């Protein structure tokens, strides 16, 4: 059974493409660029105290956006309630945020304090999370946008931000899946726990293919 077959058999689950994070995306000027807003992708971040995670993309009026905010399923994060903001051209929103906005932009804010977290079991990595924000709508204007994750209380904590619904994997993504699974499980602090069978199968097949491809190159 190939990794592709495993992904097809579990097609009802989310299979976000992993986006590497060098932890430098703390301002609009240093925002992580999203090149395809429709592709299902996720970035993990150990948000520092009083810090933000900034992502940016270009869009046209009417373009759809789907975005999520979540935190790892860890006891110490049970009451952690970070927020998400969409920053963009005038008309994006009229909310205030606890950080400086780029000139000529406005913000729409998604707070989570009054929202009920949704438990999420991610079968490919064998990790669990609480989803705090899940929003889908059409963008109001042409221009540059930012997705910003932040903590209104100014505390640090682990979180992830995801966007897009279209699931697509390239061959190099499959070769790297075993490394992604390792990194994601470490972020969720379950790296020392036994992997579920599906996670183990995907990780093992990816590792074997990676080794074989290395030797035939």
Language-model-derived ranges and their functions:
Residues 80-109:
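Extended low-complexity, serine/threonine- and proline-enriched intrinsically disordered segments
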Residues 54-76, 144-152:
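Hydrophobic beta-strand segments within beta-rich accessory/binding domains
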Residues 1-8:
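Bacterial N-terminal signal peptides
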Residues 43, 103-138:
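Extended, solvent-exposed segments with strong compositional bias
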Residues 16-28, 55, 82-93, 124-217:
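C-terminal edge strands of extracellular/lumenal beta-sandwich accessory domains
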Residues 9, 61, 76-80, 141, ...:
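Short loop/turn segments at connectors of secondary-structure elements within structured domains
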Residues 34-52:
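N-terminal edge beta-strand
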Residues 11-15:
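Sec/Tat signal peptide C-region and signal peptidase I cleavage site
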């Amino acid at each position: 059974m190939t990794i592709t077959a495993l992904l097809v058999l579990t097609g009802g689950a989310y299979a976000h493409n992993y986006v590497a994070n060098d932890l430098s995306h703390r301002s609009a000027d240093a925002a992580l660029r999203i090149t395809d807003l429709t592709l299902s992708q996720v970035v993990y971040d150990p948000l520092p105290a009083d810090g933000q995670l900034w992502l940016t993309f270009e869009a046209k009026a009417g373009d759809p956006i789907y975005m999520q905010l979540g935190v790892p399923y860890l006891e110490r994060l049970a009451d952690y309630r970070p927020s998400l903001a969409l920053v963009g051209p005038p008309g994006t929103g009229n909310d205030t945020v606890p950080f400086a906005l780029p000139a000529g932009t406005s913000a729409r804010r998604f707070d989570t304090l009054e929202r009920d977290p949704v438990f999420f079991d991610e079968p490919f990595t064998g990790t669990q999370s609480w989803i705090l924000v899940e929003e889908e709508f059409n963008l109001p204007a042409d221009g540059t946008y930012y997705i910003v994750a932040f903590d209104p209380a100014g505390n640090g904590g682990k979180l992830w931000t995801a966007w897009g619904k279209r699931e697509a994997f390239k061959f190099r993504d499959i070769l790297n899946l075993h490394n992604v699974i390792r990194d994601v499980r470490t972020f969720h602090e379950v790296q020392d726990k036994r992997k579920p069978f599906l996670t183990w199968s995907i990780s093992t097949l990816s590792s074997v293919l990676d080794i074989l491809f290395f030797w035939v190159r």
